Amino acid sequence: MHPDTRSQPFAPLFDDVIVLTGPTASGKTELALRVAETLAARTNGRQEIEILSLDAIAVYRGMDIGSAKPTSDQLARAPHHLIDLVDPWDEFSVAEYLHSAHACVQDILERSKRPMFVGGTPMYLKGVLRGFDAGPPADEAFRNAVEEDLRQHGIGALRERLHQVDPLSAAKIDRGDSRRMIRALEFARATGTPISHRQLQFDTARSSHEGLVFALRVPRPVLHQRIEKRVEEMFAEGLVAEVQGLLALEQPLSKTSRQAVGYREIIEAIAAGDAPETAAERVVFHTRRLARRQETWLRSFSEIRGLGSFESDSAPDIDQCVESMVETILSFSD
């Protein structure tokens, strides 16, 4: 961890960047590359985009197939950043991501290029658009004690404990996300203030003008088909072997990397003595659920411009999205 990131507040990057987001498997990567190529061609190279990954799993080295990192051909089409930052046994916080993101944006702007964030991790998106305050440093003794209580009494008791000090966080945090519940308890204990109160300050932060934040909106049946196809391709490309290789590393995987969709299901199948390939259906189910959560999050961001319905992989649909984004970006450049 960067030593100065745990308690450092981060200002929004809203005014300085382009953002392309959307649920998993919605086609963000290819669309971003098409936009970058089209914008450079339209401006005779005066506006060149560099892409910053907005994905919490792509930061991990060796977690390539399951996180759908850009291929080598895609990486060659535009500079990419914020990929392969840490080892899969490391934890990597939102604050650490934003520390790296701010440094990347500054470097890109100093070289007179255009930074474009591409991805769908909600907490990263929130930090980019509205800023972030990491709060007090971790209290390892307190965390260990709470984790022991969690093992003994279960996550329901942990949620009830959080409800007593921060009912808003208890209601908002995903029911299975013990890590965020513990952090909320830790924050309240250290500051005497619920973390939800602090977050409200950032939720209400807005840029002084309308920005370049785009979201792909894909009809649910089409998105489900894409997810099924993507999972099938991931297993064909060697996702099981990738997970087995990660489990064979000299250090155990971090909690974040072990719980990533696409990895967790195979790890659980191996632990249960089942054939890893049997996890494919669970990966599809959990990926669909992840996409629904992402869509819910995206609806809460008033900054976002919804792109037209991206209903297929056909050239006209993709061309329409590219044209919409490029025209809007150019209108802000005038």
UniProtKB/Swiss-Prot annotation:
What molecular function terms (GO) are annotated for this protein?
Answer: ATP binding; tRNA dimethylallyltransferase activity
Q: Where does ATP bind?
A: G22, P23, T24, A25, S26, G27, K28, T29
What GO terms describe the biological role, i.e. biological process, of this protein?
tRNA modification
Binding partners and assembly? Monomer.
Keywords associated with the record: ATP-binding, Magnesium, Nucleotide-binding, Transferase, tRNA processing
For substrate, which residues are the binding ones? T24, A25, S26, G27, K28, T29
Q: Which cofactor does it need?
A: Mg(2+)
Lineage runs: Bacteria, Pseudomonadati, Planctomycetota, Planctomycetia, Pirellulales
What family is reported? Belongs to the IPP transferase family.
Known role: Catalyzes the transfer of a dimethylallyl group onto the adenine at position 37 in tRNAs that read codons beginning with uridine, leading to the formation of N6-(dimethylallyl)adenosine (i(6)A).
Q: Which residues form the signal peptide?
A: none
This chain belongs to which protein, by name?
Answer: tRNA dimethylallyltransferase
Task: Name the residues annotated as site: Interaction with substrate tRNA.
Answer: T121, R143
